[in-house]
């Protein structure tokens, strides 16, 4: 699984991403914004 741009944060956190700043979590939109095309692997 990867955490792609503009997916729901709940989906992303289910993959084990739990550090907002590393992934550009935007509290205003409850979405994750990633400024790279690289695939991010789950941490859990």
From Swiss-Prot:
Protein name (Swiss-Prot/TrEMBL): Unknown protein 1
